[in-house]
């Protein structure tokens, strides 16, 4: 056997986990059948699950903990993706358990399965060579990662000394596991493949082309002088970051897919996990929005600039989900703006409506009257509309101030096409006329504005306003990823690229 083989990569991975504060071990000893596991078919370490439920819910009786265990173990579907969604919901939202209130009436309480507020209060474990026997198949994933006893990560590693042991072979092995030992994926959050040189991650439903590297640990610098596997593991599995991914960067979506057997399109539940550029951009955009919407904020959330193929639509979903949950925003209202009905239908119907991550159901405004009604609500709401619904009526009726709340956030898709025209000009009949963006701002005077665009905002024919630009590329391009702050984007012409100032956020090379 080569001195540098698959076992070497496994041990290196365990060392990286140990540096993150995980307990590590050798599964034949530390997850032995007969002592730790009742059966080789057990993929969950139930003693650790029980211990976590008791520790994280000190007021829960042993009976309640037992009921929670039964709820976790009780399958509701034979479909692995549906079961994965069920376990994900239990991890994020808690395990519902029936009990009695102080007055003797039936009540439902949620027992925490994960402590999201104190990451180190959870039980973190990584084991290699974990043998699983299921449906007559005996398989041994290279490394399993456990959170409070649940196998949330799976690593498939190949021998870097073997030129035939490629990333594709590692992905193929995961497909074998999906068909032969599907139970290991029921609680799974992330799968990782590596050939010892390259490393990539995705959800277990991801095709090979959807596995992507994670190129930064802290979101500031791309690391090229350390192993890709180390960067990925320390970037994704650091406890605080991993829990952020679990709660805010995993989306299940009912989408049309091609059935390989029949050749027909059908709808299926797809699981997506954010790629590294989506993760860091969303967190930067959320913090920028919170700053801009605060008492001393300037209401300019910034512009997220993408190139094609970088996952803008789902990034907007992640942004909405995380911002809506942030207590600093006090249950905000989000208004998503497009400049065409077909784009409004597409973003709402194909991306947001099927996405099972949002804390409330998005609504598409059908007309000006409904939009006005939706925007007068006291709090909350994810509203979709075209900018034209802010236009004056045929009788000259303009929008009144619909709400003066500061926790209203307007998100403009392809912002370069709609966020201009802030000044009044004389029309051909000598009447003052303002652009749609001004009418929208008049109706929402204290709203914060965030833009998404795939077009560089530096042309001279638009007055797009923003205070910061977060630029993103596709994962395959060789362009730089960076966040820049513009001095002020308030003149009649967009500022040229030379005026951008770099601020602390990723300066990344893809």
Name each region found by the language model.
Residues 353-395:
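Inter-Walker segment of RecA-like/P-loop motor cores
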Residues 296, 408-409, 415-418, 428, ...:
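Conserved N-terminal glycine/acidic-rich loop preference
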Residues 223-228, 461-510:
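Interdomain helical connector at the RecA1-RecA2 junction of SF1/SF2 helicase-like NTPases
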Residues 380-439:
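Conserved RecA-like ASCE ATPase "motif II neighborhood" in helicase/translocase motors
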Residues 336:
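Conserved SAM-binding loop
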Residues 307-308, 416, 437-460:
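Conserved helicase ATPase motor motifs in RecA-like P-loop NTPase domains
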Residues 191-194, 383-386, 410-411, 448-453:
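Structural recognition of the conserved hydrophobic beta-strand(s) that form the central parallel beta-sheet
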Residues 2-8, 14-333, 342, 346-358, ...:
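ATP-dependent helicase/translocase motor core
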